[in-house]
């Protein structure tokens, strides 16, 4: 896949995840509501930034970003969720799946950018690979049981 096609795919995915993370944000229930509510707010704000960054990089490369809502939703390949009530644990597990998906997509973007000798996009991809690897490590630690003494 070309760099611009991968960026457009990720733009659509970021839009979908922005909506999806709002669903988690508004519809989480349980004892850890407040912390998950704050975490998902940060997550959807990051998706808005990713949406903008992907679109702007596409424009810098001389192509057109996706601006039609219908096209964004049709092109999103990120994991779908069909519910509107979540436990805190479910939200963390679902975000883990979403971040694993994004990590894989950034690796594809990095590979495409390196093939096309696009160092700017490769740097963008690598920065996000590091970000999502760290996020996944933190989520993994959250999902583990208590330490044994």
UniProtKB/Swiss-Prot annotation:
Sample GO molecular function, one term: oxidoreductase activity
Subcellular location: Cytoplasm
InterPro entries: DPS_DNA-bd (IPR002177), Ferritin-like (IPR012347), Ferritin-like_SF (IPR009078), Ferritin_DPS_dom (IPR008331)
Catalytic activity: 2 Fe(2+) + H2O2 + 2 H(+) = 2 Fe(3+) + 2 H2O
Pfam families per UniProt: Ferritin (PF00210)
Keyword vocabulary terms for this entry: Cytoplasm, Iron, Iron storage, Metal-binding, Oxidoreductase
Induction notes from the record: Constitutively expressed. Not induced by hydrogen peroxide or by iron.
Lineage: superkingdom: Bacteria
Residues binding Fe cation 1, per UniProt: 25, 52, 56
UniProt record, GO biological process: DNA protection; intracellular iron ion homeostasis
Main subcellular location of this protein, as a coarse class: cytoplasm
Enzyme class at the top of the EC tree: oxidoreductase
Binding-site residues, Fe cation 2: 56
Disulfide bonds: none
CC per GO annotation: cytoplasm
EC assignment: 1.16.-.-
Protein's job: Protects DNA from oxidative damage by sequestering intracellular Fe(2+) ion and storing it in the form of Fe(3+) oxyhydroxide mineral. One hydrogen peroxide oxidizes two Fe(2+) ions, which prevents hydroxyl radical production by the Fenton reaction. Does not bind DNA.
Family: Belongs to the Dps family.
Assembly with partners or alone: Homododecamer. The 12 subunits form a hollow sphere into which the mineral iron core of up to 500 Fe(3+) can be deposited.
Official protein name in the record: DNA protection during starvation protein
Organism classification: Bacteria, Pseudomonadati, Campylobacterota, Epsilonproteobacteria, Campylobacterales
Gene, per the UniProt record: dps
């Amino acid at each position: 896949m070309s760099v611009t096609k991968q960026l457009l795919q990720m733009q659509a995915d970021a839009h979908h995840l922005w909506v999806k993370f709002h669903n988690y944000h508004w519809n989480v229930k349980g004892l850890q509501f407040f912390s998950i509510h704050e975490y998902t707010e940060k997550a959807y704000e990051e998706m808005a930034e990713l949406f903008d960054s992907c679109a702007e990089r596409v424009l810098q490369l001389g192509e057109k970003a996706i601006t039609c809502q219908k096209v964004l939703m049709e092109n999103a390949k990120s994991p779908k969720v069909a519910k509107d009530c979540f436990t805190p644990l479910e939200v963390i597990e679902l975000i883990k799946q979403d971040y694993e998906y994004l990590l894989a997509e950034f690796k594809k973007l990095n590979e495409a950018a390196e093939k096309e000798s696009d160092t700017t996009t490769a740097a963008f991809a690598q920065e996000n690979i590091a970000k999502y690897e760290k996020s996944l490590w933190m989520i993994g630690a959250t999902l583990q049981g208590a330490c044994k003494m």
